Design a protein with these regions (language model features):
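Signature of N-terminal electron-transfer/Fe-S-associated modules in redox systems
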Residues: 1-152
Length: 152
């Protein structure tokens, strides 16, 4: 089946198998920030933006992205690097495996609500799993970033 997908601003036309998952499509195109974790839509590691909304790419067929814009962390380098520095500064990068999903979802939250409360942050990021940091570093990084951005 032929699909037309805009990936990180680049228009692509690809022949794909009907059962190809979006996570496999973006990884095949070299977007390795998108991680395979639980494969049941429970961990947030595979988060990408579809038309600027966060979706879990492990549970969406690539065919559903036909005609849509998909953005991965690679497509948000400037924005992600700025924010990622605050995550790292707060010790949330023990292994770093979960960071792309956290960063994608945090950026989605900031777009939806530029000044979220701590409780709203916790609620929004509840679907992101981290196996080693206990979430406090990510939360501190987000709060530090928001304070910096507000005073910028």
């Amino acid at each position: 089946m032929l699909v037309n997908i805009t990936l990180n601003g680049k228009k692509l036309t690809r022949e794909i198998e009907a059962d190809l998952l979006l996570i496999d499509f973006v990884r095949n195109e070299g977007c390795l920030s998108v991680k395979r974790g639980c494969e049941t839509s429970n961990c947030g590691l595979c988060t990408v933006f579809m038309d600027d909304k966060p979706v879990l790419s492990c549970s969406i067929l690539a065919a559903r992205a036909d005609g849509h814009a998909i953005t991965t962390l690679e497509g948000l380098q400037e924005e992600a690097a700025e924010f990622g520095a605050f995550i790292a500064d707060q010790g949330a990068e023990q292994c770093g495996f979960c960071n792309p999903g956290f960063i994608m979802n945090a950026l989605a939250l900031f777009r939806e609500n530029p000044e979220p409360s701590e409780e709203e942050i916790k609620e929004y990021l509840a679907g992101n799993l981290c196996r080693c940091s206990g979430y406090e570093g990510q939360l501190r990084g987000i709060l530090s970033f928001l304070a910096w951005k507000k005073n910028k």
